[in-house]
Amino acid sequence: MGILSGNPQDEPMHYGEVFGLWSYVMAGNKMVGNYQMLLNHVGDDDLKKLLRESIEKCQDEIKQVSTILKENGVALPPASPEPPTADLNDIPPGARFLDPDVAASAAAENAAGLVTCSKMMGQSIREDIAMMFGQFHMSKAATGAKYLRLLKNKGWLIPPPLHLQKHHEA
């Protein structure tokens, strides 16, 4: 029997895991608040639906990670209060975020979450934590595909310079 080869949930977390989990909850709380605030600015129904789905997934992830932190005696980071809802028409035109910008921002935040999940998978020595972040990663990849499809279908995607020349072998 090797070191830390028992039930992963009975194993201690190392400092990197503790900080990574704690930071994930803190960033997740902030992301939920950001998405809730951005919902006030969105007029497109498809984007609203995807933002609400993103909020629900993030809240579920926060709950799972918070459970592990609590079980290991780690205090949770503070969460911001839920932002108030506002009517889209009450937001002055110059102060309103546009739907294409909201979609691009949400897609970028989701992509950053993929990187964070990969980092946590790589640094975890507890299999349960690595597997949990593997599941989060798969979910974020699927959500990222939905954002990409939405951006393309709505004509909101701003592509980088496209390489149109074919490579010819000599």
Curated annotation (Swiss-Prot):
* InterPro entries recorded: DUF3231 (IPR021617), Ferritin-like (IPR012347)
The protein's matches in Pfam families, at most eight in alphabetical order, are given as: DUF3231
Q: What is this protein called?
A: Uncharacterized protein YvdQ
